[in-house]
Curated annotation (Swiss-Prot):
SMART domains attached to this UniProt entry: GatB_Yqey
Short name of one Pfam family: GatB_Yqey
Transmembrane segments: none
Reactions mediated catalytically: L-glutamyl-tRNA(Gln) + L-glutamine + ATP + H2O = L-glutaminyl-tRNA(Gln) + L-glutamate + ADP + phosphate + H(+); L-aspartyl-tRNA(Asn) + L-glutamine + ATP + H2O = L-asparaginyl-tRNA(Asn) + L-glutamate + ADP + phosphate + 2 H(+)
The protein, known as: Aspartyl/glutamyl-tRNA(Asn/Gln) amidotransferase subunit B
Species, as recorded: Halalkalibacterium halodurans (strain ATCC BAA-125 / DSM 18197 / FERM 7344 / JCM 9153 / C-125)
Cited PROSITE patterns: GATB
InterPro entries recorded: Asn/Gln-tRNA_amidoTrfase_suB/E, Asn/Gln-tRNA_Trfase_suB/E_cat, Asn/Gln_amidotransferase, Asn/Gln_tRNA_amidoTrase-B-like, GatB, GatB_C_1, GatB_Yqey_C_2, Gln-tRNA_amidoTrfase_suB_CS
Any one biological process term the GO annotation gives: translation
Taxonomic lineage from the root: Bacteria, Bacillati, Bacillota, Bacilli, Bacillales
Amino acid sequence: MNFETVIGLEVHVELKTESKIFSASPNHFGAEPNANTSVIDLGYPGVLPVLNKAAVEFAMKAAMALNCEVATDTKFDRKNYFYPDNPKAYQISQFDKPIGENGWIEIEVDGTKKKIGITRLHLEEDAGKLTHSGNGYSLVDFNRQGTPLIEIVSEPDIRTPQEAYAYLEKLKSIIQYTGVSDCKMEEGSLRCDANISLRPVGQEEFGTKTELKNLNSFNFVRKGLEYEEKRQAQVLLSGGEILQETRRYDEAANKTVLMRVKEGSDDYRYFPEPDLVALHIDDEWKARIRSEIPELPDARKKRYVEELGLPAYDAMVLTLTKEMSDFFEETIAKGADPKLASNWLMGEVSGYLNAEQKELDEVALTPDGLAKMIQLIEKGTISSKIAKKVFKDLIEKGGDPEEIVKAKGLVQISDEGELRKYVVEVLDNNQQSIDDFKNGKDRAIGFLVGQIMKATKGKANPPMVNKLLLEEINKR
C-alpha cells in the first residue's frame, strides 16, 4: 500500500517591538533572568493590560506580506491552562477572530512551484521559559513572558519534509524582509511545531496526526518529519494504529520520542478577554501599513534577473536572507559589477561564514570594501587569485583593499616586458612541455602557466601570460 504524507506547520514568531504586547517592559533578548518584567507580566491582582499598537501593526504587516486578509474587527481571548511558566494561569491570545486569515506563500522544490495556504495568523503573548536544573527543581525566567508573538498556521498542503523545509525558509525570508522579526531560532524568536499524518493514496479523509516538538532548526524539522513519515508507514503496514500523540525530536538519536498521548483535543476554555476592548482596523489604517511593506524576496529576485541580468539561481540564493540581499544591493551601489559581486558573495563570503559559523554583521567585511576589491580585479590591478588573499584581510580585519594590496606587495604584474622575461625563462627550462603542446596536448599550456604563476608568486596577469606563452612557443 502506498501512502500520502500530510503535513501542517505552526510557526511562532516573536515581534521585534521595543516593549511587550501588554506592558511597558523592555522586549530585548539576553537580559539577566527576570530583569525585563513588571506586575502586568507577572499577573499581579488588579493590574490591567494595555495593547501595544506597534505589535498590532507588525502583525498586520506580516499578514499582508503573507497574502492574508486582514480583519476589520478582531478581539483577544483568554486561553486557560496551568503551567509554571504561565503566571496568570491563562494566556491572552486570539481564538475565533484572528487578525489575519486565508493567506498563502509560494515555494519551489526541485524546480516545481507550489502554493501553500495559510489558515490564520493571530497575535498572542509568549510565556516564560523553564530551565530544568535537576535535583528536583526547575527555574523560570519571565523575561519572555508577554513578548508579542504571531502564530502562523499553515493549511495541511505540505506533502513532503522537503516542502516543509522550503516553506519555513520562505516564511522566514518574508518575515525578515518586513522587519517585524529577526527570526533567530537560536534565540527563540522563531519556533516551529509540526503535525504529520499518513493516508492511503487517493483517500480524502486525513489520517490520525502526530505533533512534533523540540524542532530547534529547519534541518531538524526536515529530519524529524522524515523519521516520523517512515515510523508511521511501518506501523500502518504492520497492521497497527497511529495514536494521536505529541512526540519530540531527539537530534542525537535522529528519531522522534513519545512525550505524551492525547486523549482528545485540548480544552483551553477560551472566552473573550474582559480587560481589552475589541479592535477595529479601518481601511485607512490598512492602507498605511500596506504602503510601508518593503520590496519582498520574490519581487527582488525578479528584479535581479530582469534588470541586473543575474541567473535565476544567483537571484534565489542572494534573496534568501535580507541580510545577504541588502549587502549585495549596497555593494553594487558602490560600483561593483553585479555578477562579480554575486559570485563573491555566493562563493568566498558564504564559504567563510559557513566555516566560521558567523553572520555578515559579525565580520569586518563591508559593501564598500568588497566593491573596491572587485574594482581592483576589473582594472587588472590584482588577479582573482590574489584577490582571495586581500579578501581574507578584509573579512577578518577590514581596511581599504588598495592599501592592503600596496602593503603586501600584491599588485598584479601586467608589464609585458617583465612578464616576457618570466615566460622565456620557464620555456627555456621546459622543452618537453613545449613539444607536448605542439603535439596536441593542450594540458601542457596549463602546466607552463602554473610555473609562471609560481615564479611570480601568483602576481602575473593570467590573460597576458597565456598570450605571451603562445607568442613565444610559436617562435620556437
